[in-house]
Regions:
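Short acidic, hydrophobic short linear motifs in intrinsically disordered regions
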Residues: 1-3
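Short amphipathic alpha-helical interaction segments
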Residues: 5-22
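A short, conserved structural fragment
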Residues: 20-31
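A cross-kingdom feature that marks ATP-driven nucleic-acid transaction machinery
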Residues: 30-33, 38-177
């Protein structure tokens, strides 16, 4: 609050509620945390595009996007856009997984490395926490070709799964999806 020069009078909470209601942000509580620790995520597609690729750019080439196809800036944008499209289509993802009828809460999750517990830092794009005591761990990867899970990436996914299990102490079945 102090960084944004807001008074501690509830006005900032009202602004966040308004932004969420209008679809500019979403809030979620990370599994294992209190509601007071909610995370707010900017989800408005144009606003994200503007801050990432337009603001503070000195580009006046009308063919800019055509000329960036295959370049890192374009690939980065495709990855970010794909992740947001997935987050906007959770009902369709649930349908493809065959769990449309299962009550599900969803969120992202992250943790810092913890040497004491022997876990690496991890971030999970999407968790589908299902009423049937299963949690789908979803990683969203954009690829212009068929995405192949390498041995190294498989190891990384298993590390994330282990970090999640250790930090949250969940007893639910964990499915990497």
């Amino acid at each position: 609050l102090s960084a944004g020069k807001f008074e501690d009078n509830g006005a900032f909470s009202e602004i966040l509620k308004d932004l969420e209601w209008c679809g500019f942000i979403r809030s979620y509580t990370m599994m294992g945390y209190r509601t007071k620790s909610d995370i707010f995520q900017l989800i408005d597609h144009y606003t994200l595009f503007y801050f990432r690729f337009i603001k503070n750019q000195d580009i006046n080439d009308e063919a800019f996007w055509t000329n960036t196809i295959g370049q890192p800036i374009h690939t980065t944008w495709c990855g970010l856009a794909f992740e947001r499209v997935c987050l906007c289509h959770i009902p369709q993802i649930k349908a493809k997984l065959g769990i449309s009828g299962v009550l599900t809460n969803y969120c992202a999750w992250r943790t810092e490395a913890d040497d004491e517990l022997g876990i690496y830092g991890a971030q999970i794009d999407l968790l589908l926490d299902r009423k049937d005591n299963i949690i789908n761990i979803c990683e969203m990867k954009y690829s212009s070709d068929e995405y192949v899970i390498t041995k190294d990436y498989d190891t990384e996914l298993r590390r994330k799964k282990n970090a999640f299990k250790v930090k949250t102490k969940t007893r639910k079945a964990l499915h990497i999806t």
